[in-house]
């Protein structure tokens, strides 16, 4: 797969039932573009996740006073690595994504499709998605998103617009009844899944 320069996500479930989900980022455009000469570590540009007065971010989000820079404060983040468990505490699904502000909508929609609508993990990840980030007040939709749903959204006052490349990559693992693990990696940006006995 091609190398990307921003966020990465990994979901892991062990045969013993332990789960780890990690979303990590150096932010946009290969971090700060700087590498430590002594360690070789690439430096991030997470300061860009704070709001700056009168400057919209790369995703079209306007500045918010709640996200202005303050000493000791962390910037707002869209990452949402998630582990779902059943009533007994057993892992049912491990999921997360990359893709800036689209992470939250992609993870929540994919999770809903699996947990509420009974889709398998591949169907849930591969199906077309919607995205709404509150501001600007519009719903972006992927090519082939069901027109019937879009028309219903328009009928209740939503503005819709087609999204170009959707840019969010979801990785998920679902435990099936009987304990079998199934996994899928989003076709939208390339990658792979693997399993070991």
Curated annotation (Swiss-Prot):
SS bonds (residue pairs): none
Subcellular location: Secreted
Pfam families the record matches: G_glu_transpept
Record-level GO cellular component terms: extracellular region; plasma membrane
Keywords: Hemostasis impairing toxin, Ion channel impairing toxin, Platelet aggregation activating toxin, Potassium channel impairing toxin, Secreted, Signal, Toxin, Voltage-gated potassium channel impairing toxin
Domain of life from the UniProt record: Eukaryota
Reported tissue expression: Expressed by the venom gland.
Residues annotated as transmembrane: none
MF GO annotations: glutathione hydrolase activity; potassium channel regulator activity; toxin activity
InterPro entries: GGT_peptidase, GGT_ssub, Ntn_hydrolases_N
Predominant localisation class: secreted
Keyword presence, Signal: yes
Entry keyword DNA damage: no
Signal peptide annotation: 1-6
Biological processes, Gene Ontology terms: glutathione catabolic process
SUPFAM superfamilies for the chain: N-terminal nucleophile aminohydrolases (Ntn hydrolases)
Family: Belongs to the scoloptoxin-11 family.
UniProt function note: May act as a voltage-gated potassium channel inhibitor. Is highly similar to the subunit beta of SSD14 which, when complexed with subunit alpha, induces platelet aggregation and hemolysis.
Entry protein name: Scoloptoxin SSD20
Species, as recorded: Scolopendra dehaani
């Amino acid at each position: 797969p091609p190398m990307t320069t921003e966020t990465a996500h990994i979901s892991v479930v062990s045969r013993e039932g332990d789960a780890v989900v990690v979303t990590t980022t150096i932010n946009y455009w290969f971090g700060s573009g700087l590498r430590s000469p002594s360690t070789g570590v690439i430096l991030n540009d997470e300061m860009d996740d704070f709001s700056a007065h009168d400057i919209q971010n790369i995703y079209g989000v306007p500045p918010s006073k709640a996200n202005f820079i303050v000493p000791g404060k962390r910037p707002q983040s869209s990452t949402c690595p998630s582990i779902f468990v059943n009533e007994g505490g057993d892992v049912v699904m491990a999921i997360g994504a990359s893709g800036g502000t689209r992470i939250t909508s992609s993870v929540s929609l994919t999770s809903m499709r699996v947990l509420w609508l009974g889709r398998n993990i591949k169907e849930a990840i591969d199906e077309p998605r919607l995205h709404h980030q509150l501001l600007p007040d519009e719903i972006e939709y992927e090519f082939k998103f069901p027109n019937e749903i879009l028309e219903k959204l328009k009928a209740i006052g939503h503005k819709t617009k087609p999204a170009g490349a959707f840019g969010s990559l979801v990785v998920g693992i679902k435990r099936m009844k009987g304990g079998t693990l199934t996994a899928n990696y989003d076709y939208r940006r390339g990658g792979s899944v693997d399993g070991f006995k």
